[in-house]
Regions:
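Glycine-rich anion/phosphate-binding loop at the beta-strand->alpha-helix junction
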Residues: 126-171
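Conserved catalytic cysteine-centered active-site region
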Residues: 116-129
Length: 171
Protein backbone atom coordinates (compact mmCIF):
# COMPACT_ATOMS: atom_id res chain seq x y z
CA UNK A 1 0.00 0.00 0.00
CA UNK A 2 0.83 3.65 -0.10
CA UNK A 3 3.09 5.12 2.53
CA UNK A 4 1.17 8.38 2.41
CA UNK A 5 2.81 11.59 3.52
CA UNK A 6 5.63 10.20 5.64
CA UNK A 7 3.24 7.46 6.78
CA UNK A 8 1.16 9.85 8.87
CA UNK A 9 -2.60 10.41 8.92
CA UNK A 10 -4.38 13.62 9.86
CA UNK A 11 -7.28 12.77 12.16
CA UNK A 12 -9.99 15.36 12.83
CA UNK A 13 -10.61 15.99 16.54
CA UNK A 14 -14.08 17.40 17.17
CA UNK A 15 -14.09 20.18 19.73
CA UNK A 16 -15.60 23.65 19.77
CA UNK A 17 -13.01 24.55 17.19
CA UNK A 18 -12.06 22.06 14.51
CA UNK A 19 -8.54 20.83 15.08
CA UNK A 20 -6.47 18.07 13.56
CA UNK A 21 -4.20 15.61 15.26
CA UNK A 22 -1.61 13.80 13.18
CA UNK A 23 -0.67 10.26 14.15
CA UNK A 24 1.54 7.62 12.59
CA UNK A 25 -0.42 5.44 10.17
CA UNK A 26 0.87 2.33 11.95
CA UNK A 27 -0.50 3.57 15.29
CA UNK A 28 -3.85 4.42 13.75
CA UNK A 29 -4.06 1.05 12.00
CA UNK A 30 -3.34 -0.76 15.28
CA UNK A 31 -5.99 1.27 17.12
CA UNK A 32 -8.64 0.70 14.44
CA UNK A 33 -7.85 -3.03 14.28
CA UNK A 34 -8.15 -3.25 18.07
CA UNK A 35 -11.60 -1.66 18.00
CA UNK A 36 -12.76 -4.03 15.25
CA UNK A 37 -11.39 -7.06 17.15
CA UNK A 38 -13.24 -5.86 20.24
CA UNK A 39 -16.45 -5.94 18.17
CA UNK A 40 -15.84 -9.60 17.25
CA UNK A 41 -13.92 -9.43 13.99
CA UNK A 42 -11.15 -12.07 13.76
CA UNK A 43 -7.63 -10.55 14.11
CA UNK A 44 -6.51 -11.05 10.49
CA UNK A 45 -9.76 -9.60 9.16
CA UNK A 46 -9.59 -6.68 11.61
CA UNK A 47 -6.04 -5.94 10.47
CA UNK A 48 -7.09 -5.95 6.80
CA UNK A 49 -10.15 -3.73 7.31
CA UNK A 50 -8.10 -1.32 9.44
CA UNK A 51 -5.41 -1.15 6.75
CA UNK A 52 -8.03 -0.41 4.08
CA UNK A 53 -9.52 2.44 6.13
CA UNK A 54 -6.15 4.02 6.94
CA UNK A 55 -5.01 3.60 3.33
CA UNK A 56 -8.08 5.56 2.18
CA UNK A 57 -7.14 8.40 4.54
CA UNK A 58 -3.52 8.33 3.36
CA UNK A 59 -4.75 8.63 -0.22
CA UNK A 60 -7.01 11.57 0.69
CA UNK A 61 -10.30 9.65 0.42
CA UNK A 62 -11.40 10.62 3.93
CA UNK A 63 -15.07 9.86 3.23
CA UNK A 64 -14.11 6.17 3.09
CA UNK A 65 -11.34 6.16 5.68
CA UNK A 66 -11.36 5.97 9.47
CA UNK A 67 -14.47 8.18 9.39
CA UNK A 68 -16.32 4.90 8.66
CA UNK A 69 -15.11 3.18 11.86
CA UNK A 70 -18.06 4.17 14.11
CA UNK A 71 -20.53 2.78 11.55
CA UNK A 72 -18.51 -0.41 11.02
CA UNK A 73 -18.16 -0.98 14.79
CA UNK A 74 -21.86 -0.32 15.41
CA UNK A 75 -22.95 -2.69 12.64
CA UNK A 76 -20.71 -5.43 14.07
CA UNK A 77 -21.94 -4.79 17.63
CA UNK A 78 -25.60 -4.79 16.55
CA UNK A 79 -25.04 -7.93 14.43
CA UNK A 80 -26.04 -6.14 11.24
CA UNK A 81 -22.69 -7.23 9.79
CA UNK A 82 -21.58 -10.86 10.00
CA UNK A 83 -18.15 -10.86 11.72
CA UNK A 84 -17.27 -14.35 10.44
CA UNK A 85 -18.80 -14.66 6.97
CA UNK A 86 -18.37 -17.73 4.82
CA UNK A 87 -17.50 -15.80 1.64
CA UNK A 88 -17.72 -18.09 -1.36
CA UNK A 89 -18.04 -18.33 -5.12
CA UNK A 90 -21.68 -19.04 -6.03
CA UNK A 91 -21.15 -19.66 -9.72
CA UNK A 92 -18.28 -19.20 -12.13
CA UNK A 93 -16.80 -19.64 -15.56
CA UNK A 94 -13.23 -19.32 -16.83
CA UNK A 95 -13.36 -15.50 -16.82
CA UNK A 96 -16.23 -14.64 -14.48
CA UNK A 97 -17.60 -15.39 -11.04
CA UNK A 98 -20.42 -14.47 -8.67
CA UNK A 99 -19.38 -14.15 -5.02
CA UNK A 100 -21.67 -14.40 -1.98
CA UNK A 101 -20.41 -12.18 0.85
CA UNK A 102 -22.64 -13.81 3.52
CA UNK A 103 -23.37 -10.40 5.07
CA UNK A 104 -19.69 -9.75 5.77
CA UNK A 105 -17.77 -6.49 5.87
CA UNK A 106 -17.42 -4.94 2.44
CA UNK A 107 -13.61 -4.74 2.54
CA UNK A 108 -13.41 -8.48 3.21
CA UNK A 109 -15.85 -9.31 0.42
CA UNK A 110 -14.12 -6.83 -1.90
CA UNK A 111 -10.72 -8.40 -1.20
CA UNK A 112 -12.06 -11.90 -1.85
CA UNK A 113 -13.79 -10.85 -5.08
CA UNK A 114 -10.68 -9.06 -6.34
CA UNK A 115 -8.49 -12.07 -5.49
CA UNK A 116 -10.85 -14.29 -7.51
CA UNK A 117 -10.80 -11.76 -10.36
CA UNK A 118 -7.01 -11.53 -10.35
CA UNK A 119 -6.63 -15.33 -10.49
CA UNK A 120 -9.11 -15.58 -13.36
CA UNK A 121 -7.55 -12.65 -15.27
CA UNK A 122 -4.09 -14.21 -14.96
CA UNK A 123 -5.51 -17.42 -16.42
CA UNK A 124 -8.01 -16.12 -18.99
CA UNK A 125 -6.61 -12.68 -19.86
CA UNK A 126 -9.48 -10.72 -18.30
CA UNK A 127 -12.25 -11.35 -15.80
CA UNK A 128 -15.40 -9.94 -14.25
CA UNK A 129 -16.50 -10.75 -10.70
CA UNK A 130 -19.67 -9.58 -8.99
CA UNK A 131 -20.56 -9.84 -5.31
CA UNK A 132 -23.81 -9.85 -3.38
CA UNK A 133 -24.81 -9.85 0.31
CA UNK A 134 -22.02 -7.54 1.41
CA UNK A 135 -21.94 -4.52 3.69
CA UNK A 136 -20.32 -1.11 2.98
CA UNK A 137 -17.64 -1.60 0.31
CA UNK A 138 -15.09 0.95 1.46
CA UNK A 139 -12.74 2.73 -0.93
CA UNK A 140 -13.00 1.15 -4.40
CA UNK A 141 -9.48 2.26 -5.28
CA UNK A 142 -8.09 -0.07 -2.61
CA UNK A 143 -9.20 -3.13 -4.62
CA UNK A 144 -8.04 -1.72 -7.96
CA UNK A 145 -4.60 -1.28 -6.41
CA UNK A 146 -4.58 -5.00 -5.56
CA UNK A 147 -4.75 -5.71 -9.30
CA UNK A 148 -2.14 -3.04 -10.09
CA UNK A 149 0.27 -4.71 -7.67
CA UNK A 150 0.04 -7.78 -9.96
CA UNK A 151 0.62 -5.66 -13.11
CA UNK A 152 -3.06 -5.88 -14.02
CA UNK A 153 -5.66 -3.22 -14.68
CA UNK A 154 -8.37 -3.50 -12.06
CA UNK A 155 -11.72 -1.76 -11.82
CA UNK A 156 -13.83 -1.90 -8.70
CA UNK A 157 -17.29 -0.44 -8.29
CA UNK A 158 -20.40 -0.84 -6.23
CA UNK A 159 -24.03 0.22 -6.12
CA UNK A 160 -25.23 2.99 -3.86
CA UNK A 161 -28.42 4.81 -3.02
CA UNK A 162 -29.06 7.94 -5.09
CA UNK A 163 -27.70 10.92 -3.20
CA UNK A 164 -27.81 13.83 -5.67
CA UNK A 165 -29.53 14.77 -8.87
CA UNK A 166 -27.68 14.42 -12.18
CA UNK A 167 -26.58 17.60 -13.94
CA UNK A 168 -29.71 19.44 -15.02
CA UNK A 169 -31.95 17.05 -13.07
CA UNK A 170 -34.40 17.70 -10.26
CA UNK A 171 -34.47 14.28 -8.64
Amino acid sequence: GSAGVAGRCPIPTWTREMTQTTVAASQLTAMVAGILRHQGLPPEDADFVAASLVEADLRGVHSHGVLRLPRYARELREQITNPRPQIRVLDEGPAWARVDGDGGMGPLVGRYAMQVGIAKALSAGSAVVTACRSRHFGSAGFYALMAAERDLIGMAMTVASPSLAPTGGRQ
